[in-house]
Amino acid sequence: FLYRQAEIIDEKQWDDWLALFGDDGIYWMPSEEDQMEGDGEPNVFWEDNYLMQMRIARNTHPRAHSQAPHNRLCHVVSNVIIESEDANGDIIVRSRFHCAEYFRYEVRNFTGKYRHLLKKTDDGYRIALQRTDLVNREGPYEYVIQWWL
């Protein structure tokens, strides 16, 4: 599941990526490592399905000049550990990642930890919550993060 998600992001298959999330799924990138709550707190990302769709529409629009030329991403996901499973088959999965982004003739590297709460459904798992903790969250960036890592 996690490897497929990384491939979907790298290939910019946004409809497939959104389909990995449950109807009330959340993508969360906290601004602090010890942050326990995302709702109502400062975050890099705290996005539900509606906000994710809005970001895709904005960044893929033909006149999204801030995204020209389009970036290229390459994810590596490793150290996948199933932390827990409940009686319903829902699981919490921890993993590590490295993402290289090539954009405007430069490469930016992002590394960190994922924590997924995956809800079991009749047709597979869906993301209820994806938490992405960046190792280099305090690093200086010439431009903001436009896409999910």
Q: Model regions: which residues?
A:
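A solvent-exposed, acidic/Ser-Thr-rich amphipathic alpha-helical stretch
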Residues: 23-94
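Short, aromatic-enriched amphipathic alpha-helices that serve as compact interaction elements
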Residues: 1-10
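Aromatic-acidic/polar surface patches that form glycan- and anion
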Residues: 10, 45, 107
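A beta-strand edge to alpha-helix "cap/lid" segment located at domain peripheries
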Residues: 81-149
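Short, well-ordered alpha-helical segments enriched in acidic and aromatic residues
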Residues: 12-28
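Hydrophobic pocket/interface hotspot
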Residues: 5, 17, 52, 93, ...
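Alpha-helical hinge/cap motifs
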Residues: 10-13, 123
